[in-house]
């Protein structure tokens, strides 16, 4: 009888099983580019559409936004682009945590500095209310902060 009472007490005190995290997805590339452009305006840079930068003899990185008259910009890299670039895009160093990833081009693009932002770093879920874990606003603010930090460095170091 005592065993049944203890078992009933333990069952009543047990918590619900842990639930799986909400499925997430990255910011849409068009929205990400809008945020990048706004960050350029915030830092008093003139954003213009970017162009491809040679990373390897047969592979180019599409830069989404560059500063007018300068050789620095931002590339929002999607899964498709990562797949196409393969090993031409240097791997991120896990020891660096969430440090910004900068790449330079080859040849004529050798002095170009590009901030590579991976879509997988800007995830959100579609849930609302208390079920919401990763908001769109949080992902957008993180992207804006990362671009702003890059631009502050570009200005401080007087990049071409």
Regions found by a protein language model. Give the residues of each.
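Bacterial N-terminal signal peptides that target proteins for export
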Residues: 1-2
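C-terminal motif of bacterial Sec signal peptides marking the signal peptidase cleavage site
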Residues: 9-12
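Acidic-basic catalytic patches of nuclease active cores, encompassing PD-(D/E)XK
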Residues: 14-52
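Non-catalytic C-terminal interaction segments of nucleic acid-processing enzymes
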Residues: 20, 24, 37-38, 68, ...
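Acidic helix-start/capping segments at beta-turn-to-alpha-helix junctions
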Residues: 55-63, 117-123
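Alpha-helical scaffolding within the catalytic cores
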Residues: 58-64, 97-102
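Active-site beta-strand-loop-beta-strand hairpin of nuclease catalytic cores
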Residues: 63-76
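Catalytic cores of nucleic-acid endonucleases
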Residues: 78-142
């Amino acid at each position: 009888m005592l065993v049944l009472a203890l078992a009933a007490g333990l069952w009543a005190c047990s918590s619900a099983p842990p639930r799986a995290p909400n499925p997430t997805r990255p910011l849409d590339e068009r929205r990400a580019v809008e945020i990048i452009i706004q960050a350029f305006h915030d830092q008093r840079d003139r954003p213009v559409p970017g162009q491809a930068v040679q990373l390897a003899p047969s592979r180019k990185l599409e830069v989404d936004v560059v500063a007018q008259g300068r050789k620095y910009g931002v590339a929002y890299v999607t899964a498709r682009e990562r797949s196409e670039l393969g090993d031409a895009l240097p791997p991120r160093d896990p020891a660096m945590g969430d440090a910004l990833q900068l790449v330079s081009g080859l040849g004529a693009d050798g002095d170009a500095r590009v901030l590579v932002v991976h879509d997988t770093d800007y995830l959100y879920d579609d849930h609302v209310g208390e079920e919401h874990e990763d908001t769109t606003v949080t992902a957008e603010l993180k992207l804006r902060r990362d671009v702003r930090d890059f631009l502050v460095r570009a200005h401080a170091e007087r990049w071409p």
